[in-house]
UniProtKB/Swiss-Prot annotation:
Entries under Gene3D superfamilies matching the protein: 3.30.2010.30, Neutral Protease Domain 2 (1.10.390.10), Peptidase M1, leukotriene A4 hydrolase/aminopeptidase C-terminal domain (1.25.40.320), tricorn interacting facor f3 domain (2.60.40.1730)
Highest taxon in the source lineage: Eukaryota
Organism: Chaetomium globosum (strain ATCC 6205 / CBS 148.51 / DSM 1962 / NBRC 6347 / NRRL 1970)
Record's catalysed reaction(s): an epoxide + H2O = an ethanediol
GO MF assignments: aminopeptidase activity; epoxide hydrolase activity; metallopeptidase activity; zinc ion binding
Residues at which a peptide binds: Q135, C136, Q137, P265, Y266, G267, G268, M269, E270
Its biological purpose: Aminopeptidase that preferentially cleaves di- and tripeptides. Also has low epoxide hydrolase activity (in vitro). Can hydrolyze the epoxide leukotriene LTA(4) but it forms preferentially 5,6-dihydroxy-7,9,11,14-eicosatetraenoic acid rather than the cytokine leukotriene B(4) as the product compared to the homologous mammalian enzyme (in vitro).
Family from the record: Belongs to the peptidase M1 family.
GO CC field: cytosol; fungal-type vacuole lumen; multivesicular body; nucleus; NVT complex
Identification of the protein by name: Leucine aminopeptidase 2
InterPro entries: Aminopeptidase_N-like_N (IPR045357), Aminopeptidase_N-like_N_sf (IPR042097), ARM-type_fold (IPR016024), LTA4H (IPR012777), LTA4H_cat (IPR049980), M1_LTA-4_hydro/amino_C_sf (IPR038502), M1_LTA4H (IPR034015), Peptidase_M1 (IPR001930)
Alphabetically ordered keywords of this record: Cytoplasm, Hydrolase, Metal-binding, Metalloprotease, Nucleus, Protease, Zinc
Pfam families: Leuk-A4-hydro_C, Peptidase_M1, Peptidase_M1_N
């Protein structure tokens, strides 16, 4: 019997494994809950040795459980910290190895569900209909339905969702018009590729859609549809072509993007078939769609090949950032773009490590997760430190050789989960082939233990600075109080070049004066920018300059954007310069933020646990 490798699950998934899940839910906007049933088809991993099935749950109202259509003995045990409450179901006679049993669980979500956010019509752009969406990563699927909530278990899915409004889910829509049942319609989806529970996703609201590629559509509010289509349609197929050339053909059938309301807490969530995306990517300049390259890359790294626990999360994100940068360099037809993006990422990594402290457990590539909530460890570290490890292997063996390893790795592990050591074994096994004998000495010098377990920054590579040299030169000019800026300084730059410039200025030992900060905002049109990435970076400079005229703008932005990348960093800085405004701004917008975001900002501001 295989060991349980994931410390963030209470399930006995080494004794029973979910093979198929059927989620049959009514979206109740009045009660703000999902109600209905799930059927879990679990395969016995022992020969009648296990007499109970243990599932993860968190604040779920379970009303009945049947085992193979027969009422069963079951109980929901007391809550055990962030892991939630185990649901224990008796299987008195056990089951033979390989035998499949069916558990049908009747349930409703509660107001303590951490995976769902419910928006009133007033919180949507056209004010016509309510909206609901899920965010299950890392361990929030258990707050929707009892399950084996671990990335080490993968299941195929059927979704049957009844709602008065349009529904999308992480499966391919079943052909045909949704059936009408009273005021509701029944939306059906099928997911043929086995996925872990954190990729379970559902959303419902006033949603319209439009084509953006040969197998891709964008879905969003009717008011935002035209702008969202324009933002994405030029690059979607290019991204897909580039990704398929690097790895192998796309496995999921469709690739669609749901642009969510502003309170969505992440840049994107790689839910299969429908990436859930922040509206901050719709900036009217096609400058922020790197997020889509990242989420598309997850179709191979993370979704097809998955880390077996959150302790090895870097295998999902480090690989994805690497593939994202390969995709972007390919479509820009400029290898310097890879390094350019890596330079921006290095800044994010430095900030994350400074925030935790360079010796903190959470700055390691592989992190101990016993007894902790994986959300608390969330940062740029698995993304950027993971990327730097993958990139170091690429440079060590050479791009031509590494490009042969990429499809081998994803073929070997597709539809499976692995840990860091299995990745190491796969790499060493591949490069032990006679054709790579000249690399033997180089490969023998890889410090695997150090890479996995040393805290702090990894070795810094030599970056190609072609695309950032001008950014550094302009930043240096701003160190002089006599410098006279002009709009032409940045008029030919991409949004990311402007971001690099702002990041450099933000790191000045001596901050700008308030007057300089105001000039920068006006002359480079940053204060009024629709590009939230640039606006947030500028506000960091303004707050460090003690430019009090910028504080109302910061507070306004914090009431319009729920993406944690911006919300948490802006609140931390605002808290340092004007704690009263920071607390008032949070209290005013508390219900606007997603539960995950709300809880983490409360910790950042020292306001106690979320209720």
């Amino acid at each position: 019997m295989a060991p349980v490798r994931d410390p963030n699950t209470l399930s006995n998934y080494n004794e029973w494994r979910t093979k198929h899940t059927t989620a049959d839910f009514k979206v109740d906007f009045t009660a703000k809950c999902l109600r209905g049933s799930v059927v879990l088809e679990l395969e016995s991993q022992t020969d009648k040795a296990s007499k109970e099935i243990i599932l993860d749950s968190s604040y779920v109202d379970v009303s009945a459980i049947t085992l193979n259509s027969t009422p069963s003995q079951w109980e929901v045990r007391d809550r055990t910290g962030p892991s939630g409450s185990p649901v224990r179901v008796a299987v008195p006679n056990g089951a033979g190895k390989g035998e499949v049993v069916k558990l049908e669980i009747e349930l409703a979500t509660t107001d303590k569900c951490t995976a769902l956010q419910w928006l009133t019509p007033a919180q949507t752009s056209n004010k016509k209909a309510p909206f609901m969406f899920s965010q299950c990563q890392a361990i929030h699927a258990r707050s929707i339905f009892p399950c084996q909530d671990t990335p080490d278990v993968k299941s195929t899915y059927d979704f049957i969702i009844r709602s008065p409004h349009v529904v999308v889910a992480s499966g391919v829509p079943v052909p045909g018009e949704p059936e009408s049942v009273g005021e509701d319609k029944v939306y059906k989806f099928h997911q043929k590729v086995p996925i872990p529970s954190y990729l379970f996703a559902v959303a419902s609201g006033d949603i319209a859609s439009a084509k953006i590629g040969r197998c891709s559509s964008v879905a969003t509010g009717p008011n935002e549809l035209k702008a969202s289509q324009w933002e994405l349609e030029d690059d979607m197929d290019k991204f897909l072509d580039a990704a398929e050339k690097i790895v192998f053909p796309y496995q999921w059938g469709e690739y669609n993007v749901l642009v969510l309301p502003p309170s969505f807490p992440y840049g994107g969530m790689e839910n299969p078939i429908f990436t859930f995306a922040t509206p901050t990517i719709i900036s009217g300049d096609r400058q922020n769609i790197d997020v889509i390259a990242h989420e598309l890359a997850h179709s191979w790294s993370g979704n097809l090949v998955t880390s077996c626990s959150w302790e090895h999360f870097w295998l999902n994100e480090g690989w994805t950032v690497y593939l994202e940068r390969r995709i972007l360099a390919s479509i820009h037809k400029n290898d310097s773009y890879f390094d350019f993006s890596a330079i921006i990422g290095w800044k994010h990594l430095e900030e994350a490590i400074e925030e935790f402290g360079k010796d903190h457990e959470y700055t390691k590539l592989s992190i101990k997760h016993d007894g902790i909530d994986p959300d608390d460890a969330f940062s740029s570290v698995p993304y950027e430190k993971g990327f730097h490890f993958i990139w170091s292997l690429d440079r060590l063996v050479g791009r031509e050789n590494f490009d042969k390893f990429i499809p081998h790795y994803f073929s070997k592990w597709q539809n499976k989960s692995l840990d860091s050591f299995e990745f190491k074994d796969t790499f060493l096994e591949f490069f032990s082939a006679p054709e790579y004998s000249k690399l033997k000495d180089k490969i023998s010098q890889i410090d695997w233990e150090g890479r996995f377990f040393n805290p702090g920054l990894p070795p810094k590579p030599e970056f190609d600075t072609t695309l950032v040299d001008g950014c550094f030169q302009l930043a240096n000019k701003w160190k002089s109080k006599d410098f006279s800026p002009s709009p032409s300084d940045t008029s030919s730059w991409t949004g990311n070049q402007l971001l690099v410039f702002l990041n450099v200025v933000q790191d000045f030992e001596e901050p700008l004066t308030a007057e300089q900060s105001q000039n920068m905002g006006k002359i480079y049109a940053l204060a009024d920018s629709k590009n939230v990435e640039l606006k947030a970076a500028y506000y960091q400079i303004a707050m460090k300059a003690k430019d009090t005229t910028s504080y109302p703008g910061v507070a306004e932005l914090l009431g319009n954007v729920g993406r944690m990348k911006f919300v948490r960093t802006l609140f931390r800085t605002l808290n340092k310069v004007d704690r009263d405004l920071a607390v008032k701004t949070f209290q005013k917008n508390r219900d606007f933020y997603h539960p995950i975001c709300r809880q983490l900002v409360e910790k950042d501001l020292g306001l106690g646990e979320s209720k």
